[in-house]
């Protein structure tokens, strides 16, 4: 099974702490990339930061995808729209996921929010509502949360997905004249 193609704009997210597995036999390009695979930088930026050829970076990321050490997510923007997926239902009653989420998404120095508050915040993600609008709607609740990590956690766990919106061109057709218009 081939890993999916990797594009310049894809953002790789490591699913494991790769520094624990590194040894002298690793590919040198991959060793240079690991510090920059932070879930925020896109492939082209990682290549610039690591001073590596972008094609080699793509190949390394493909290897990480093949072995399920990483996954690709979209570039984070506050104009993005995200929604909950049905896969959230079994997670609502899992205390391990709840505590993992709280520790992953909280800003340093802030107390962890209780699980029901986090799930309420996720439930406020809607079609047509940008992250910017979502933050405005939730107000003070979001101040203790790293929004990028909040969304990334949901995407990694599979219960949040991005809604892609594309403009559609439809040719304008002049309305037909009827007898009422000519009077």
Residues covered by each model-derived region:
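Short amphipathic alpha-helical interaction segments
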Residues: 51-63, 140-156
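A short, conserved structural fragment
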Residues: 65-76, 155-166
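Long, compositionally biased, serine/threonine/proline- and charge-rich low-complexity regions
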Residues: 1-2, 152, 164-168
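Short, amphipathic alpha-helical interaction segments positioned at domain boundaries
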Residues: 78-121, 168-183
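Short helix-coil junctions and helix-kink-helix linkers
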Residues: 42-54, 120-145, 183
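Fold-level signal for large, globular catalytic cores of enzyme and receptor domains
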Residues: 16, 21-29, 79, 85
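Hydrophobic packing positions characteristic
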Residues: 1-19
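Basic amphipathic alpha-helical segments that dock to polyanions
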Residues: 46, 61-67, 134, 150-158, ...
């Amino acid at each position: 099974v081939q890993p999916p193609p990797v594009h310049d704009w894809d953002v790789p997210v490591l699913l494991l702490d790769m520094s624990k597995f590194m040894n002298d036999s690793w590919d040198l390009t991959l060793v240079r990339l690991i510090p920059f695979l932070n879930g925020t930088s896109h492939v082209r930026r990682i290549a610039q930061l690591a001073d590596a050829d972008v094609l080699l970076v793509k190949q390394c990321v493909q290897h990480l995808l093949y072995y399920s050490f990483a996954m690709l997510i979209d570039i984070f923007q506050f104009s993005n729209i995200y929604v909950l997926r049905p896969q959230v239902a079994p997670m609502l009653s899992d205390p391990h996921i709840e505590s993992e989420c709280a520790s992953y998404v909280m800003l340093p120095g802030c107390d962890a929010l209780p699980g029901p508050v986090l799930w309420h915040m996720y439930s406020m993600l809607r079609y047509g509502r940008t992250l910017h609008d979502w933050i405005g709607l939730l107000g003070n609740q979001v101040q203790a949360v790293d929004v990028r990590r909040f969304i990334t956690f949901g995407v990694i766990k599979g219960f949040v997905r991005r809604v892609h919106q594309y403009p559609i061109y439809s040719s304008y057709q002049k309305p037909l004249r009827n007898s009422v218009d000519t009077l």
